Swiss-Prot record:
<comment type="subunit">
    <text>Part of the 30S ribosomal subunit. Contacts proteins S3 and S10.</text>
</comment>
<feature type="binding site">
    <location>
        <position position="43"/>
    </location>
    <ligand>
        <name>Zn(2+)</name>
    </ligand>
</feature>
<dbReference type="InterPro" id="IPR043140">
    <property type="entry name" value="Ribosomal_uS14_sf"/>
</dbReference>
<dbReference type="GO" id="GO:0015935">
    <property type="term" value="C:small ribosomal subunit"/>
</dbReference>
<dbReference type="InterPro" id="IPR001209">
    <property type="entry name" value="Ribosomal_uS14"/>
</dbReference>
<dbReference type="InterPro" id="IPR018271">
    <property type="entry name" value="Ribosomal_uS14_CS"/>
</dbReference>
<dbReference type="GO" id="GO:0003735">
    <property type="term" value="F:structural constituent of ribosome"/>
</dbReference>
<keyword id="KW-0479">Metal-binding</keyword>
<keyword id="KW-0862">Zinc</keyword>
<protein>
    <recommendedName>
        <fullName>Small ribosomal subunit protein uS14B</fullName>
    </recommendedName>
</protein>
<comment type="similarity">
    <text>Belongs to the universal ribosomal protein uS14 family. Zinc-binding uS14 subfamily.</text>
</comment>
<keyword id="KW-0699">rRNA-binding</keyword>
<comment type="function">
    <text>Binds 16S rRNA, required for the assembly of 30S particles and may also be responsible for determining the conformation of the 16S rRNA at the A site.</text>
</comment>
<dbReference type="Pfam" id="PF00253">
    <property type="entry name" value="Ribosomal_S14"/>
</dbReference>
<dbReference type="GO" id="GO:0006412">
    <property type="term" value="P:translation"/>
</dbReference>
<feature type="binding site">
    <location>
        <position position="24"/>
    </location>
    <ligand>
        <name>Zn(2+)</name>
    </ligand>
</feature>
<keyword id="KW-0689">Ribosomal protein</keyword>
């Protein structure tokens, strides 16, 4: 889990748009966040395996 202070800092409106960054809405992780789902890869994988993300299924080819 991310520090509460860092999550609060990220949620503030930044003075410059280039300073804004994505964070996982579930756990607060700042790296490897899928913008479309607003989830990090770890949370995305957990929820996808449980079937809680509509339209997502395991690929097989």
């Amino acid at each position: 889990m991310a520090k509460t202070s860092m999550v609060a800092k990220q949620q503030k409106k930044q003075k410059y748009a280039v300073r804004e960054y994505t964070r996982c809405e579930r756990c607060g992780r700042p790296h490897s966040v899928y913008r479309k789902f607003k989830l990090c890869r770890i949370c995305f994988r957990e929820l996808a395996y449980k079937g809680q993300i509509p339209g997502v299924r395991k690929a097989s080819w």
